[in-house]
Amino acid sequence: MKIAIDAMGGDHAPKAVVLGAMKAIKEYSDLHITLVGKEEEIRQYLTSDERITILHTDEKIESTEEPVRAVRRKKQASMVLAAQQVKDGEADACISAGSTGALMAAGLFVVGRMEGIERPALSPTMPTVDGKGFVMLDVGANVDAKPIHLYQYAVMGSVYAEKVRGIENPRVGLLNVGTEDGKGNELSKQVFAMLKDAPINFVGNVESRDLLQGVADVVVCDGFTGNVALKSLEGTALALFSMLKEQLMSSFTSKLAAAVLKPKLMVLKDKMDYSEYGGAALFGLKAPVIKAHGSSNDQSIFSAIRQTREMVAKEVIPTISSVMEKESLQ
């Protein structure tokens, strides 16, 4: 199995990418990795090149660039070349911690959309209080969704949750403003009716306040709603930790309490860090394309590689294609 990784994408590239890749190589004996980027910079951190190949390029896509234009103009950019490795059959999947928009464009224009899938979805695994997490899609790839798009997201998310996350008969919920049948706008009502007859374990509408309680294993929504929910959860978690830190540092006695509580607080912080679950998968493409968090450290990159390897090994893409074909959606 071979995975191509954009070594220049992310806030801590290439160091975090290289260290994460070496960690994955040690863990998985069947894995080969191609690091795409500036060879001189990559080799500064590469202490072992066992089953690691470097594809040199001086070009990269900056986060400030317009995504589609950058992908079309910069054919030799590290992210584009990683996607090209997949298209050419040189890699089974690709990963990048670079620009989300650029990776979506590279996925569509280079890797290609799966036949029958109208719009791809961006899907991270979000944390829950019990540590199991849930898959959420879409969180920004498609802000103007149609009912058929969300139907397809539900099927793809269900396959992923079962194959990669090991959840038998995963619960699929539709993010809505209430749990009762008939709630929501016209899009929600149409999708609800379609999902009731889908070949999945549809548990009905779910509200955003219940997401972290693990009300569903897969949560489906349009990209606009999903992105707002994602950013709200991120912001709330950061604000709570910030307020907690301020209170714990407010007096001598509270500082003593903080010293005692620190190990438990670090466990809690790690549990709420969704980057530990891997990256956000771009569902609906011909091969696995994973968006690692922009601030990924080496452990986050390792988690994204582990996730990608599971998607390839468990044949997630062929399974999705087969299910869609059975549903006469292709």
Curated annotation (Swiss-Prot):
Biological process, per Gene Ontology: fatty acid biosynthetic process; phospholipid biosynthetic process
GO MF terms held by the record: phosphate:acyl-[acyl carrier protein] acyltransferase activity
Gene Ontology, cellular component aspect: cytoplasm
Keywords assigned by UniProt, alphabetized: Cytoplasm, Lipid biosynthesis, Lipid metabolism, Phospholipid biosynthesis, Phospholipid metabolism, Transferase
Domain of life: Bacteria
SUPFAM superfamilies: Isocitrate/Isopropylmalate dehydrogenase-like
Pfam families documented for this protein: FA_synthesis (PF02504)
Keyword Lipid metabolism attached: yes
Pathway assignment: Lipid metabolism; phospholipid metabolism
EC number: 2.3.1.274
Localization per Swiss-Prot or TrEMBL: Cytoplasm
InterPro entries in the record: FA_synthesis (IPR003664), Phospholipid_synth_PlsX-like (IPR012281)
Catalysed reactions, semicolon-separated: a fatty acyl-[ACP] + phosphate = an acyl phosphate + holo-[ACP]
Family: Belongs to the PlsX family.
Subunit structure: Homodimer. Probably interacts with PlsY.
Reported function: Catalyzes the reversible formation of acyl-phosphate (acyl-PO(4)) from acyl-[acyl-carrier-protein] (acyl-ACP). This enzyme utilizes acyl-ACP as fatty acyl donor, but not acyl-CoA.
Protein's UniProt name: Phosphate acyltransferase
